[in-house]
């Protein structure tokens, strides 16, 4: 029997009952070597017919092309997308004698019949669908060439025939979709997509690995000598915590080095009260390292597995309370501290990705006491000693405000003094705190009131000596001497025998003395009396408190 006629007869029958077409061809070959010749031929050297018509013999259904073993694709399974690699299916070109056939298809038992020692991602065969079957229309037509005539059929016929099959119309969840060779770029594009997918899988891990449970605030970033990547500096946001963290991040998002300085003296914050850094970190990572598989509008199985939130159309947005380690969080956030007008301790942190306002813990304040007085000087004497440590102009008052601190050791009292904006003569003094010590006994350096050193009392004894002498005896002796001196002045006559009235021709120095608690204090005062009549009552009563007893002194015969 002619081998070529035998091949045509076998192909016209049921292809599913004939077994392996390759084995039949080897058993029917003329010289026994034709069956192995196609294995040595390059796919580019296979003859391809350019015929545009197709002839299907009677008794052959178009759906049998999909079920025939001829359409088995030599898919070499490789590690699944979970390990960072993709499938690389390669179609097998089979030629029989003078005929050649190039096709692509899937069988239900394709993956179950494959034997591999590597890890494979195999979805259930019953739920597997022929992905992207509609793309066959855009591919070159599949040709079949016989002995005496050539016949070809376009992919549209197979697609239309496959559309009537109930097996192909079965809905399948997207997560079980298997990528085909048309979904994966060829050549360098395929390698690029594999490498980018691996970067995406690694890019999502740094924020998780660097999460230590604390809240961090970024305060700087710079390039350090000897480091390949920039170094970011973070500080713990807990009040009075001095722990700092610095780490270096590579260009692909990998955290290469993390250094902690100090030890936390507080427990980790609750998850509900942590800063929202995870969302900012994810947004920054997506902006800096976009996934190349995201450019495929139709999507593939690998993209759906690595990015499940993009497949469903509902982007996964972390809650506001969710947090990252703060290192990744603060890379795109800039915390802005806004001090209050009169409250230097209260600060608000405004996050770009969240509207959470976290007030810092304020120290306990002492009560304030405000005193307003009218004075020409700014500082009033309150008995305490103060040291000035600052001055500034506050908003709403053009007059400067001076800040003082009590000089006593350990005293927390402070005050600030300023003149009122509505009244320049009014001095406003604000005290903060309470003194924990007594008022100093010595005179304050800020005392501007001049007190008299000596205040004579009306009951004190005063001796008017009139320049003759100073008495240090008791009050009786001083009084007797005073009367004696007055008597001498009255009886005094002029050398020429002319009587005179009690007149002081020249200023005289008078001394006064007072006996106070056994101590004699002396003073000197210059007095002038140029009147003709000597009136003793004109003397200063403060230095001579006794009432005059001689009246007007006159001299005469």
Curated annotation (Swiss-Prot):
SMART domains: WRKY
This protein's GO CC annotations: nucleus
Protein name: Probable WRKY transcription factor 20
GO biological process: positive regulation of DNA-templated transcription; response to 1-aminocyclopropane-1-carboxylic acid; response to wounding
Renumbered residue ranges of the record's region Disordered: 1-36, 76-215, 257-348, 433-486, 520-557
Binding-site residues, Zn(2+): 236, 241, 264, 266, 406, 411, 435, 437
Function field: Transcription factor. Interacts specifically with the W box (5'-(T)TGAC[CT]-3'), a frequently occurring elicitor-responsive cis-acting element.
Major localisation: nucleus
Location(s) in or outside the cell: Nucleus
Sample GO molecular function, one term: transcription cis-regulatory region binding
Low complexity bias: start-end ranges: 151-169, 321-332
Chain residues forming the annotated DNA-binding region: 205-269, 375-440
Biased composition (Basic and acidic residues): 1-12, 282-299
Bias type Polar residues, positions: 95-114, 193-207, 303-314, 520-536
Top-level taxonomy: Eukaryota, Viridiplantae, Streptophyta, Embryophyta, Tracheophyta
Alphabetical UniProt keywords: DNA-binding, Metal-binding, Nucleus, Repeat, Transcription, Transcription regulation, Zinc
Family under the similarity heading: Belongs to the WRKY group I family.
Organism: Arabidopsis thaliana (Mouse-ear cress)
